[in-house]
Amino acid sequence: MGFFNQALVFLLATSFLSTPVLAQQDTYDYIVVGSGPGGGPLASNLARANYSVLLIEAGDSSTQGNSGQYPPQITWDFFVKHYSDEKRNMMNNKLVWKTTAGRYWVGAGSDKPPAGAKFLGVYYPRGSTVGGSSMINAMCTWLPPDSDWNYIANLTGDASWGAANMRKIFERIEKNNYLPKGTAGHGFDGYFQTNMNKPGSIGQPVLGIIQAIAANFSKPTDAASITSSMGSDANYLDPKRDWTNGIWGLPTHTKSNGERFSSRDYIQDTIKAKFPLTLSVNSLATRVLFSTTTCNNQPRANGIEYLQGKSLYKADARYTGSNNGTLKTAFARKEVIISGGTFNTPQLLMLSGIGPKEQLEQFKIPVLVDLQGVGKNMQDNQEMPIIGQVSGQTSGGFTQPIIMMTTPHTPDGERDMFLMQGSFAFRGFWPSNQTNSALPQDGPGTYGISMVKNHPQNKKGYVKLQSADPREVPEINFMLYEEGKETDMGAMKYTIAWARKIYAAAKGITVAAKEPPCPSGPDAQGSCGQADEDWITGQTFGHHPTSTAAIGKDGDPMAVLDGRFRVRGIRGLRVVDASAFPRIPGVFPVVSTFMLSEKASEVLRGEAGDDICAA
């Protein structure tokens, strides 16, 4: 008996949980695991092509609107590390512990948490409801540089991945609510709704700071020109876009009435229209099932095993361990598609015997395919605010102006820094129900310029199993600045110095640079040297994980997928979510993931009649 067949027999005969009763009536053309921006549109598109589809979602169908908060009914609470060095991990000022009473406590690594509190790490929320993280994100809709799509085209040798074709895909899915119909590069009849607030009168300190930025870019500084820039379209069609510094408005995935649009809306519309889409909520996928027969000596996926029940995953704050769920199976006539997201997709692959051999053997998981790239190559946009203290009257809150600029550390000549700003300090994420009453709060006059690094060079992050139990959360470490440090941290340091000079040059308002702190005072270029580097090391955060099941070249041992989303070494199994990107697309990957999903829909519809064992 061959190696694959031995592993298949073992997987079919055993389970971490128990052997389920097979229900052959639970058979569909396709099974999609995950309802976020990758899986939700794909499942809907396949159903609209009249294929029967089962869409499995581990969360329920709770909603929250536009609040940007992370209530437990729609959020999984992941806690991650940034470094392998615990000393650097403890430099962060917003770490999380769990007290003996089961409550979160947030503080700096140098603080003293309550006695007996368990250290958790850096808070990293993910959406866990129908719609996935498109239900909890900030809705920023910023198209990636063309080079990110062309990179995939070059890797795969498939020109349909190129920027020109991917822009056509964007035009097809977009339903633009803020531009005149017919505007080049945009769509007006799709399902993916976009909108942008029009700026009104601009008060201080925004006006004075934006005027200083405009002057720095040699742009007009009068209020009318500033207002016009803040209402301009950042996703305009222009071959020079990715090299152009300037000021724009912020498009979001929102409806014409300002409400959040998410993949949930498209799923609901598909079901309401009576297409053959079955949505199963509170359904935690535990492993992929495989046929007893192989395709050309490769395992063939033919179903999913899952637990049905509420709050079964340990990242759910409501998890108690008292509910074991009901073990179920479902089968696919054609294919299984995993869209669980950057953390959970590699976890499910590994639980199914697909991943680094040494990890699987550690937890006695039979190895179907030794795919070393599963769970590796994880990337994120580095983020951090530069905070000022404004003297005098201010108009507070989040404001519209978005800056894209090129630093001397750009790896390819393209813009490498995205900046949003306003009377707030966006220092990252921590549970809103935390119990540390002494946690420092920002007072009146706080102003922040928040960095999001474009084209980050670090690809050393990872997701690893901690157990063969599918309810257990994996180990997650972003390994920040492990590679490409000179480029990534260099751009961050440059932007800090630049922002200090912008604050000093603000028109009609006094703004004192406050954070990162610079005890000795900045030099003539605005830099504080090693102090800035130490602050960046401690306070960098992110919330755009990608690339843990990446598309790659044939022959690359780290490539998990081919250019048609197929898991290498397996038949009938694909991955369609942000984990598939070989490098992080732009500064906010949500719109790119919707586009990826549409691309996958094209591929699957085109291959639906093919013999799965022939290709």
Q: Where are these predicted regions, by residue range?
A:
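N-terminal redox-cofactor-binding region of secreted/periplasmic oxidoreductases
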Residues: G2-A615
